[in-house]
């Protein structure tokens, strides 16, 4: 064995340079052990070289693979981060700002609408002034609630109480049917109330109701039945409210601005005596005020008292003490009825001549509730007048000539306890 290795040793010493270059540099040793170790290590060195050469490739591939996978993983990570919030799915929160502006800027009105279903349920009625009460997206309904809220200076609780009472009253009374009724006596109410509608140049309409207190022929006949008088008065008011066309509204009125759904009222006291207060008038007037204050809030734009004696100025001065400024600012006493049309320059020609305009008298062109002629009432009235004349003649004959004539009671005594409070 040693001979063989001795024979091979010179061959390794004289090996070509190319063979040495292909392998690891050989360490030349004088001992056989080093040579044997070198010979044994050379194949391993080649394997290691091959392995070493292959490993970078694998590592490079792994590195490239890792580099390629990292963007993919990065792409997946943001997607996973964006999914949890799901902001688009939280629709209820996003829809809250879409609340109508008139509710967003008026929390009291918003609260009032929240109470509306309970109000309608407790009253058992869902109609006001010809407007079916719906939700906050319905302009006519919004306008109705605004009026009740304004009448109570923004107090939701008070507005709720008033609306509830008004709805219950409408359910019990059915004022719309009263306006269409034809059972009102012409003898009792003929010539006492009228309705006119005047048009502005821009097409806007002004509704005016006229109460001619001087037209009362017999106090007891007109005011004797208080309930009948109130029904007639409500019927006239309902006709005027219908002319406002609130159910046709397409826009919401400005809570703090002008309200186009209001009317003008004129109370004419021509030929009315203010010397004494008749109990029948007082009772009928008081009841009318109660009904109108509750059931017709914020429907009055202005109220004119015409042909009022100058001495009655104290009445209006006293009223300012008990009523709010918002109410009294709407009252305008005018001693001469012929000056009324001056208050409406753009409508002056449409007013009756007796009130300073150019139009015919109210009896000729104005509207009123349907009246029926009562044949028996006039006969009774004529008989009572004839009897009164006989009694008066008998008294004249029995009086001494020197005795002064006793003053007769004026039958046309009409004093409204609080005339300005007819409609708030």
Curated annotation (Swiss-Prot):
Biased composition annotated in UniProt, kind: Polar residues: 1-16, 50-68
GO biological process assignments: Golgi to plasma membrane protein transport; regulation of exocytosis
Pfam families with a match to the protein in the record: CRAL_TRIO, CRAL_TRIO_N
Start and end residues of each CRAL-TRIO domain: 188-363
Keywords: Cytoplasm, Endoplasmic reticulum, Heme, Iron, Lipid transport, Membrane, Metal-binding, Microsome, Transport
PROSITE patterns cross-referenced by the UniProt entry: CRAL_TRIO (PS50191)
Compositionally skewed regions (Basic and acidic residues) per UniProt: 383-411
Necessary cofactors: heme b
Catalytic activity: a 1,2-diacyl-sn-glycero-3-phospho-(1D-myo-inositol)(in) = a 1,2-diacyl-sn-glycero-3-phospho-(1D-myo-inositol)(out)
A cellular-component GO term for this protein: plasma membrane
Region: Disordered, residue numbers: 1-98, 372-424
Membrane topology note: Peripheral membrane protein
Protein's recorded name: Phosphatidylinositol transfer protein sfh5
Gene behind this protein: sfh5
